[in-house]
């Protein structure tokens, strides 16, 4: 069921057989211990069981056509999985789904190099890497050490950093699943950015920095939202969520995707990726949620910006490599692009070339996960854990998997 406009307006206004690694069983406060003080007691709410069938239906999680037995050469029932966990009782919660599999927990402590060094002794025996928390398990040294590795479960939607961590991953040697459909908070970031730029609220904020109150020069912005056309480039999980929200605000939505012309009812037209040059001129707002692949690198250049409707808004939550930054800067300065907003989401952070400080540009740091959950709401993180636990059960049983990435074929 789609969200109503009132829902959107309200949105805008406003957790046995296991081995413990990195001392997660204690999880005492490190600074307090260092000072000799007793660790403060921590009370964690019980981990909800979750309803995986409801999750599949709500987010449209895609089940693989083949089973794990069919997709993984020489598949055997796993004996051990290496799991990056978020809390000390997470392992027991996961163990209920795979009672005959040894689970080894890892948790972030120290530098990335120290984390890898502590995990290395366990990697050699791991049949699977399951990660939803730091430390990242998708590290080249760990992959090389994991001689029995057959399956990797990553939590994120942007899996290019994992894909590029190892030639074996890029070649599709391992079964790879991710959390691409469970990233509604990223879509909320895009929605907020879009509304901010359409209503020129960014100019109002900058007014607060001036010595006196003065009405901003809105130029050609301060738009009415209803009736405008949004083009979503990359109709995956994030793009679909944004399209739903924009439709609820009264916008017309068109989109592109690499796989097919199929899309939800709230999208008027879904074109293939090669239709982007023809569709981009129809949009008042262009929102990019496409993956970073060799095919998408630099796709938004001077020629593509020239095809946009003059004064249209450009926003992106994708990797910076999709955008030729000097070309975007030139388009903003000339007025061809009326305003632009995007995230700095790969490290180390940098000032985008030619864009930093421009009055019609909104730049944010990457904040894909919510900082504060709504009281009583099931968090995105818990939904991700429910999906990953189900995949652990399915892989162990050799069944069809959820959210399989076709890295060798499509790059994501």
Q: Language-model segments: what does each one mean?
A:
Residues 168-229, 403-404:
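Phosphate-binding beta-alpha-beta segment of Rossmann-like dinucleotide-binding domains, i.e.
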Residues 167-182, 309-313, 330-346, 356-372:
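Rossmann-fold dehydrogenase core element
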Residues 235-236:
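Glycine-rich Rossmann-fold phosphate-binding loop(s) that bind the pyrophosphate
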Residues 239-240:
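N-terminal Rossmann-fold NAD(P) dinucleotide-binding loop
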């Amino acid at each position: 069921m789609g969200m109503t406009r009132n829902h959107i307006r309200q949105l805008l206004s406003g957790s046995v057989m296991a081995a413990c690694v990195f001392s997660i069983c204690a999880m005492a406060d490190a600074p307090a211990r260092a000072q000799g003080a007793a660790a403060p007691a921590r009370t964690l709410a019980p981990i909800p069981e979750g309803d995986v069938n409801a999750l599949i239906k709500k987010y449209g999680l895609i089940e693989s056509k083949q089973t794990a037995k069919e997709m993984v050469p020489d598949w055997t029932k796993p004996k051990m999985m290496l799991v990056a966990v978020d809390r000390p009782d997470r392992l027991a919660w996961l163990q209920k789904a795979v009672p005959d599999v040894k689970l080894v927990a890892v948790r972030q402590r120290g530098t990335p190099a120290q984390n890898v060094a502590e995990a290395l002794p366990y990697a050699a025996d791991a049949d699977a890497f399951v990660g939803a928390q730091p430390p990242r398990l998708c590290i080249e040294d760990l992959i090389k050490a994991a001689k029995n590795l057959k399956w990797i479960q990553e939590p994120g939607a942007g899996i290019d950093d994992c894909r590029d961590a190892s030639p074996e991953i890029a070649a599709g040697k391992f079964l790879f699943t991710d959390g691409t459909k469970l990233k509604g908070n990223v879509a909320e970031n895009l929605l907020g950015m879009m509304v901010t730029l359409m209503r020129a609220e960014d100019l109002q904020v900058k007014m607060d920095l001036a010595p006196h109150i003065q009405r901003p020069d809105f130029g050609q912005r301060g738009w009415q939202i209803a009736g405008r056309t949004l083009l979503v480039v990359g109709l995956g999980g994030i793009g679909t969520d944004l399209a739903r929200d924009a439709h609820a605000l009264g916008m017309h939505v068109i989109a592109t995707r690499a796989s097919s012309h199929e899309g939800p009812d709230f999208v008027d037209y879904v074109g293939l990726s090669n239709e982007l040059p023809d569709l981009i001129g129809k949009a008042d707002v262009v929102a990019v949620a496409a993956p970073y692949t060799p095919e998408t690198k630099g796709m938004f250049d001077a020629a593509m910006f020239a095809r946009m409707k003059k004064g249209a808004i450009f926003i992106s939550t994708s990797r910076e490599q999709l955008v030729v930054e000097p070309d975007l800067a030139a388009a903003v300065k000339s007025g061809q692009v009326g305003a632009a907003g995007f995230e700095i989401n790969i490290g180390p952070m940098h000032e985008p070339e030619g864009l930093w400080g421009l009055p019609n540009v909104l730049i944010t740091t990457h904040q894909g996960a919510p900082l504060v959950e709504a009281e009583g709401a099931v968090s995105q993180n818990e939904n991700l854990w429910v999906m990953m636990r189900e995949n652990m059960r399915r892989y162990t049983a050799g069944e069809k998997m959820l959210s399989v990435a076709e890295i060798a074929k499509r790059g994501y």
